[in-house]
């Protein structure tokens, strides 16, 4: 008979954990910055956002509110409702429109976030995402699996010293309105 710990170990998917950990290692999980930093929004939603061009040639990112809710719940230990998740975006650069995104003559400019209620799309100006960062994730064989959690260290890429420890937890969150719940969520980011 399998022990509870063995069952949980079997439930882990390190490939899924790896996708999330690489994003969190770079951005952290301070969601309060979303209302002022569209580059953070672009980073968090990079796997879900669709790229299009505005009439003036500016690259726009579009994400459904359902996918956005899943991402917010993935990056936080708190369980967000749709309204709570959307309120994270509401700052001086946030605008809501009653129409579909495709029907609006208005499109966001740099640092603006537009929410189109007609088809529940969040649209913002894309930022170029790079692969050059001063931090890196510790090798997989050093990850610590503890029950339904995985503790992973983030290192300074040059000195290899530990910058932070991120704890990912199997996602057992219960919320309405998402599209596809992530395998893990970020339980904590502890900086050294």
Where are these regions (language model features)?
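Gram-positive cell-envelope targeting signals
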Residues: 1-12, 168
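Short beta-strand edge/turn micro-motifs at domain boundaries
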Residues: 6, 161-192
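Core segments of small alpha/beta cavity-forming domains
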Residues: 7-119
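Low-complexity, compositionally biased segments
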Residues: 9, 16, 33, 50, ...
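Acidic, glycine-rich flexible loop segments
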Residues: 116-164, 171
